[in-house]
Amino acid sequence: MMRTRHWIAAVFAVASIAAALVELGAANRGFAAQTMQIDGTPITIYRPNAGGAPPVVVVAHGFAGSQQLMQPFAATFVRNGYIAVTFDFAGHGRNRMALGGSLVEIDGATQALVDETARVADRARDFGDGRLAVLGHSMASDIVVRFAQSSPGVSATIAVSMFAPSVTATSPRNLLVVAGDWEGGLKQEALRAVGLASAPQTAEPSTTYGRFDDGTARRAAFSPFSEHVGVLYNLASQREALAWLDGAFGTLRAPGSGGVPDARGPWILLLLFGSVLLGWPLSCWLPVADVAPSGVKRPWRRLWLPLLLPAIATPLLLRLAPTHFLPILVGDYLAVHFFVYGALTALCLASLPLPWTKTRPVLLSAGAMVVYGFVAIVWPLDTFVTSFVPSGLRVALVGVMLVGTLAYFVADEWLARGTPGAYFVSKLAFVLSLAIAVALDFERLFFLIIIVPVILLFFIVYGLFGLWAYRRTGSPFAGAIANAVAFAWAIAVTFPLLAG
């Protein structure tokens, strides 16, 4: 049962969760949010409580993102007098339409997304006074740039973490490029794009070139201590974007007032921290399956084969295997990679005794962990970060992914929980295995790079959940089942759905 340290952790976790929820609730007050659909595309309209018909800003998310991810910019704009419109691209978030067209051809998926942006923007103009600006992150930076270049009525374009080869010295109008200070390559891209207009001067960050009134304004801005996702929550990013809109639309603010940015980022981290921490004391209530913790308790010299052979053999075996059988980008490959990796691990461990464990306590513990994961991880992510609840076809995809992830985690937890340090090494080996797969087929599996941060985060969070469950139940299999469900869920809801 719970000891003093568990009670202290529980109190601290609950206090953190409560404080975060209060602040996050306040972050969504002061404006009205309305959801609707435009030709099947889910959108959210953020309107100032003051009413009126101000300019409209269409805000577009990046690859494998969703409109929830763009809430910091939307909230910043609406609190400062603009109407913001966010939406889910086809194949993303809660948009049930699959993304069509080639991912590598400009006239394929790129043009389809530009056309979808145009449909949303055409309708969004009617929500305000007719003036329009656009903001796009990562993949969507290229999309909004191309849309603005084909739509002379767009007053300003804000490209966050931009890569947009179609940018010229004069098009699109009034271009702001924002990058995180830790995005080295994208910082250079920002300066290159602005340098097209500043020439013969060398483009410098935080310097505005040209004029808003004739559409020639150009600026590159770098947000401190930010990477590819953190740049969205950085207050400097939001201030730069708001100031750019004010300049483009001629909005005047009181002296000394730079507008009110959205500070939800730290509170989201506090909420997730409290939710993870609370899992430790709650694990004390899980039923005991084995009196003595089970697992592969062997010296390291006998673990290197099951640790390294699957990591090397899996990407080699799958190099030429047909793994494109699901309508979700690289999700089918990941499912097969998990399955083959787990099967090879199990074969390597076949000479070792399978730990005996009671089935009922394991299933009860696994069920409790899965439910807690929905409450502590899925709900906060879906509400405050990005779309994380499956809909339509994605529900079935969770089940398909589970076949692969369950094979991997049952074998891996059996291997890794008995020997100190084995868990870290086994997860490192799996990530390196994915790196080998990408290196062997970069064009086909490039998008796996995007999910590696998510995999690492889930390895840490659910690794802790699994460790606490293992120490309490004595069985590695409760954590294995919970990990398998979590990873199957994350893969099925993260990657875009593809047509054909």
Protein language model features and the residues they cover:
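Soluble extramembrane regions of membrane proteins in the secretory/endomembrane system
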Residues: G25-G258
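Membrane-interface capping segments at transmembrane-helix boundaries
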Residues: A26-N28, L286-A289, Y470-A478
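Alpha-helical transmembrane segments of multi-pass membrane proteins
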Residues: A19-L24, V276, W280-P281, T314-L318
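N-terminal membrane topogenic signal
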Residues: M2-A10, S475
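Hydrophobic alpha-helical membrane-embedded or membrane-associated segments
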Residues: A10-V14, I268, L272-G279, R302, ...
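Hydrophobic membrane-insertion alpha-helices, especially the h-region
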Residues: W7-L21
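Alpha-helical transmembrane segments of integral membrane proteins
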Residues: L305-G500
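Cytosolic-side membrane-insertion boundary helix
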Residues: T251-L303
